[in-house]
Amino acid sequence: MEIAEKIAEYVNPINFENLKENIIREAKRRIIDSIAVARGALNSPPHLINKNVGKYFQGEIPLLFGGYSTPDFASFYNTFLIRYLDFNDTYLSKEPLHPSDMIGAFFSLGSLMDLKGKDLIEAIVVGYEVGVKLCDSTSLRKKGIDHVTFLQVAAVAGLSKLLKLNEKETVNAISLTLVPNIALRETRSGELSMWKAGAAADASRKATFAAILAKNGLTGPPKPFSGKMGFINVIAKDFDSSVFNNLSIEGILKTSMKKYPVEYHAEAVVEAGLRLNIDPNDINKIDVETYEAAKTIIADEEKWNPTNKETADHSLPYILAYTILRKDFWLDAYSKESIFNEKIRNIMKKINVYENEKYTSIYPKELPVKVIVYTNKGKEEVEVRNPRGYYNNPMNDAEVEEKYLRLNGKREELNMLWKIEELKVKDIVTSIKGI
């Protein structure tokens, strides 16, 4: 059976009234987290660019923190804010994903259709489940394809739920999203650019446009996955279709939140750095052992000389050196002064990163990292198996709120966001203010 058809069959029956309380609570936590990290990006250079670009897309859909635009640009704009800090949630499997990237699109079409918070929660549950299954099916990274290719399919599944598309329309929406829009992994190769966040924003934009097209009757190729020139035959012959045999509502519980503003493979690196009790001036050498994905993604050649925020938040040596020196890791770590700080650079020169095959075999059930520091006084070793926020070591509600407040959120907003079921999506969006 065509995968798009399986997804379409799954989408329609999902109903808020039948969702478990822990699933509803988790969806609310992701909404809170998404708004928190979006607010933290308000002064970022890409956001200022997007505000100027928005002048060309006049519309009536409310944007996060003020302004109005067209549905597709609102999805792009909201998602760029959510994604930019690399501080939103993550799913790690054969392919990684930042599932809350799709929430920016849900804010847009939820506002367009005058829907309520409970409709938003339904869309999140659907989108997360589809995203998790796609990431379980194959690795895109190893094929040179970017994970936002899966994001847009997951997003359009959630948007199909929001728009109440029937099964045939949902298949068309998936096809109109996937077939024209295969994203290249070059986005995340070497020195990173603003497009690291833009790729997710663009995927949300494309999913939004495809969903609206399908709602109005436009058809797409009927077999976007299984067709002769479809996704599986052209890109992913190893695609494991069986993962779609047991679609549920619990995919969101397998995804993870971030305590620190770093690429997820570096969350454990920050924790390890904070546990070390050493004088930076005494360091002779630092050996780091981790799994293949972490070494490949955050310790490749370009990550040893980061020159911008986009590369620094994907740089294991920078993140570890900063943490050892400052005994904290927050957004100020990405100032130009910090990125080019000589003391941090000197510590980076003493770091070596190695793949530990045992750790590779454990990943992604665990995210192990071991940091061994050799000093004038001897050796100190710290191992972290699962950082705080990982799905098997989740942040509690108080920690989620603490993150929201530290990113300049307001307590009254939190009180509202925990009770959004009957609130209009557009009212939720317009009530959230900037810094």
Where are these regions (language model features)?
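Hydrophobic alpha-helical hairpins/lids featuring a short glycine-rich hinge
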Residues: 82-138
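Terminal-appendage/accessory-domain detector
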Residues: 1-95, 192-205, 212-435
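Generic structural signal for well-ordered alpha-helical scaffold segments
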Residues: 110, 160, 273-277
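Glycine-rich, mobile lid/loop segments that gate access to catalytic sites or pores
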Residues: 114, 118-205, 221-228
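Well-ordered alpha-helical segments within folded domains of soluble proteins
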Residues: 100-106, 151-158, 204-209, 266-270, ...
